[in-house]
Amino acid sequence: MYKRQGLWGTSICGGEILDSAQGLPESAYLKHCVKEGSEQLRLTFEKGELKAVNDEKFDDPIKAIQKVEEIGAAYGIGRDMHVGDTIIGIKGRVGFEAAAPMLIIGAHKFLEKYTLSKWQQYWKDQVANWYGMFLHESQYLEPVMRDIEAMLESSQRNVNGTAILELHPLCFSTVGVESDDDLVKNKFGEYGEMQKGWTAEDAKGFIKVTSTA
């Protein structure tokens, strides 16, 4: 079994990984859970980029990532197994521990749910998957990558605010967000509670038209 450690986590290959039915023993991991109970983690984003951790601002994104890793790794967060495809179609399996990526990506996607429309989320995810596949298959210099990057950058213009997570040993959960771009707050009303933009008769007409179109 061998391991590769970097800024974005540690990959673990060989040994039990070669058996699709086997998991990894505790000894395979470099970082272990040393905390009990729970605590909240606040990650603040500006245009989709991580800018603050627990309200501490970072000009250097690398230091911000390292701070999240330090906090999350103490709970043993970020352990999982990845199965991927090579360019020639052979599948590979690798274990990993990556507290910072799991927490940052989880917080970012949670914030996107509040600040992007349904179709912005859908197409951003579709394009992001293609971008990841092209990048994995050494197509970074393909001109379409610049087009995809422009779309992804545009999609993040309103992804601003703080996502709040609750950390527990070996896992985390989402709590809420604080954002001036929160689309849950709107002038028409509150979902499941009340509305201010139309009457009951308007709703009946809308249902009738859409159900017969």
Task: Give the role of each language-model region.
Residues K3-A213:
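Nucleotide-activated chemistry modules centered on ATP-dependent adenylation/adenylyltransferase
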